[in-house]
């Protein structure tokens, strides 16, 4: 069957379950937007600035547990979206950036807004795929999604010349690659179980990769709940991922992100084992590389992340497991519950008590105006249970983390993302 490259590209996006794309419409990819308009399953969200479009695509990816898609036109369009792409790279968030390039006949001639995207994006994307042949378009899209959503997730750019969109092609739609899920070695699982069993004051940090290789978020969150309750463990969601554990659950051990209050952090520092489950570990989470100390932690540390290259890059853990965090949780749940797990009950209760005290709607008056805590608490009165909050990356975000409780209402086997009470913080 003959179709235009633009139509093939639109079909390829549909094949990857994309239901919306974000953009500031530009002539460099106008063929694609024309093809998308003809499709009922994909909405075009028109934005006022590429920075907003790229952040929206990033948020869409986080909420739907797949790569979001942003369309940008040539050099300036991409430059406007760089902050969001940089954020997605640092946050290990999957994102596909489709860039409309100058026509092929004008390559290398300093055509209007021409840019070398491989050089520009080298430090903030996982890959830059340049397409110059009609037969490669759908394959390039499939590869982009696979790279963006695999291992350490992140942004991938696909560069397509303007004149290519209108050309005809016989190439088929390339379907998504199977989603892979890495499993831990049995000896690593045994060692982790032993480390947790021996620990009297463990702290479990959970991050975005907890969901990265999962087909069902509800199963992951349910299993995490079960592990926390059965093994008597405190769970601390990390920066930008507060929705991973109910902040009103008795095993909630406090949020680990921007400006953790000393009343909580000082008690956390008494831990004798930190299990980092699906968190890449950054300066924000580690409180400026001091908790744990880099490169040598001051307590036992286990790091679970689906990419072996990331483990040991900054911290040298006692145990590193390059595997799906959910598969690690499932492996632990298949083991017998430690007989003396109850010894950690007081440790969990004290952490939770300190966390709950921070949730109380109390703040000091500001001599020079309104304490931002008062603003956040007032906003919280009107939030729906499934509200999504967007925040900038400044320290003021700590007020949101502290005063707005995060929870999920259901944990059914086939729960959709709308059933989750989800809070999203987009930098």
Regions found by a protein language model. Name each.
Residues 27-29, 50-52, 73-78, 99-105, ...:
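Acidic, glycine-rich active-site loops and adjacent beta-strand->loop/helix elements
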Residues 4-79, 83, 90:
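N-terminal cofactor/phosphate-binding cores enriched in small/glycine residues
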Residues 19-20, 58, 62-72, 76-99, ...:
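Structural signature of the thiamine diphosphate
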Residues 233-253:
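Short connector loops at secondary-structure junctions
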